[in-house]
Curated annotation (Swiss-Prot):
Membrane topology: Multi-pass membrane protein
Name by which UniProt lists this protein: ADP,ATP carrier protein 5
Protein's cellular compartments: Cell membrane
Family, per entry: Belongs to the ADP/ATP translocase tlc family.
GO molecular function, one term: ATP:ADP antiporter activity
Biological function: Provides the rickettsial cell with host ATP in exchange for rickettsial ADP. This is an obligate exchange system. This energy acquiring activity is an important component of rickettsial parasitism.
Length: 499
């Protein structure tokens, strides 16, 4: 009786905390490692792109870059990718895209950035033109600082291409719906633990007492930070390619891990490009998915834009900005891991809607609190006079950091894993080209729409700042979050029909 009770407890414990069978480790371990490496690079690039662009130019320029550079690049990529999957294997697509991105990052790091005065317009000339044409000053800055803008744009595309699209397409092809319920939250748990490693690593590399000083002399700390970080990114990218090769040759060919191994992976004739997009456009399911993904990008970018402007005021140099950003990434990793464990059990005990709606609700509540602090900062400080032991600027940065940690924590743990489950019941065309269109375009449409709102205001009112336009952004933010919650409810109804 005791033995039966003990066995029952063991089974329940395993189901809750380690629902992976021993024979599945050959599939689970390489996929978890691949996710870890992709997210490692993603977060190193995230720290670098913001630290470089915002410290070297300004926080306001980011919105313009997202609208006029990142979004067109994302749209172009979707068209190229839709063509590539008709002629190339997933493995080759992954190699070619990795080679392209890493080649530019290396070129920027070792050639363009150290000699930026050669490649960019002289700062004095740029300032003169911006002063002469104040309504177009941000567009002039985009062109004059093209090196920073291209680097920022490609680093912005990395997560949507390598993580959201390629990794999850790989995982969805390899994983059954039943396995997804057990694997996906653990993928998130192990993969997002990379944020903690990135946080500690980048805090050290960007600090004054960096370990780099023990191995080499440093003439320019910001150049050294970017060069060492990019070298690490290139090495990890090579490891990603080796993992994709291993999985393709050893997992996809094993009937134990992949049900289609005996008959081979799907080679059915695919639709042409125009027909494919027409097919996707008719899918209400994908349109709802697009709204959800775009809403997150739109909402979080409104909050982040104001927050990052405050960070630059507090940490004006590339290295100090990167050091703070690294601390934020570290705590985001901790939040994601905690929320992944919570989300895993929520997904088991409740339906898909309950798990999926957590993210927009938390983001809306914390975002509104942040905007209230920015808009009514003086009233709040006078109300709690003497009780707050930090400056208004430091308080705004701290509250914004907490908001972003909670928002990203729920999004990257609970929302991402629940969203990927929506693709599993779809047919092959919607799983590949449909996913590419939704995953790459939607996030960028969300961010660029947010950036468009900001860019219109800054173009019409050249003297505007993020602090001044915060009341407008707060209203828009609330509306977008409510639309996201509505779309989650509608897509749950559609999912129930086909799951």
């Amino acid at each position: 009786m005791l033995s039966t009770s003990s066995r029952s407890f063991k089974n329940k414990f395993r189901a809750a905390f380690w629902p992976v069978h021993n024979y599945e480790l050959g599939k689970f371990i390489p996929m978890s490692t691949l996710m870890f490496c992709i997210l490692f690079n993603q977060n190193v690039l995230r720290i670098l792109k913001d630290s470089i662009l915002i410290s070297e130019i300004s926080a306001e320029i980011a919105g313009f870059a997202k609208v006029y550079c990142v979004t067109p690049a994302a749209a172009l990529f979707v068209i190229i990718y839709a063509k590539m999957i008709n002629y190339l294997t997933f493995e080759k697509i992954f190699y070619y895209l990795s080679a392209f991105f890493i080649s530019f990052f290396v070129l920027f790091t070792f050639v363009i950035y150290p000699n930026i005065h050669i490649f960019h317009v002289h700062p004095n000339n740029l300032a003169d033109w911006m002063e002469r044409y104040p309504h177009f000053k941000w567009y002039i800055s985009l062109v004059g600082n093209w090196g920073y803008i291209v680097y920022y744009s490609l680093a912005e595309l990395w997560p949507n291409i390598f993580y959201v699209l390629l990794f999850w397409q790989f995982a969805n092809e390899l994983t059954t719906t039943e396995e997804a319920k057990r694997f996906y939250t653990l993928f998130s748990l192990f993969g997002n633990s990379s944020l903690i490693l990135v946080g500690f690593l980048m805090m050290n590399l960007s600090s004054e007492d960096t370990i780099i000083k023990k191995f080499m002399s440093i003439s320019d700390s910001k150049i050294t930070l970017v060069q060492v970080s990019t070298t690490i990114v290139a090495i990890v990218a090579i490891i990603c390619c080796l993992l994709v090769r291993f999985i393709s040759k050893n997992v996809f060919t094993n009937p134990l891990f992949y049900a289609k191994a005996k008959s081979g992976r799907s080679t059915s004739e695919r639709m042409g490009l125009i027909k494919s997009f027409k097919y996707i456009a008719k899918s209400k399911y994908l349109w709802l998915l697009l709204i959800c993904s775009a809403a997150f990008g739109f909402a979080i970018n409104l909050v982040e834009a104001v927050w990052k402007a405050k960070i630059k005021e507090l940490y004006p140099t590339v290295n100090t900005y990167a050091e703070f950003n690294s601390l934020y990434i570290l705590w985001t990793g901790v939040a994601i891991m905690v929320m992944t464990i919570i989300g895993n059990n929520i997904m088991r005990m409740h339906n898909w809607f309950v798990a999926a709606v957590i993210s927009p609700v938390i983001i809306m509540v914390t975002g509104i609190l942040f905007f209230v602090l920015i808009v009514f900062d003086q009233q709040i400080l006078s109300l709690f006079d003497g009780a707050i032991l930090m400056s208004p600027l430091a308080l705004a940065v701290s509250i914004g950091g907490i908001q972003n940690i909670l928002a990203k924590g729920t999004k990257y743990s609970i929302w991402d894993t629940s969203r990927e489950m929506l693709y599993i019941p779809l047919d092959e065309e919607l799983k590949t080209k449909g996913k590419a269109a939704v995953d790459v375009i939607s996030a960028k449409v969300g961010k660029s729409s947010s950036g468009l709102v900001q860019s219109i205001i800054f173009t019409l009112v050249p003297t505007a700042t993020f602090t001044l336009i915060s009341p407008i952004l707060m209203v828009v933010f609330t509306f977008v979050c409510l639309a996201w919650i509505y779309a989650v409810r509608k897509i749950y109804c559609e999912y129930q029909k086909i799951a």
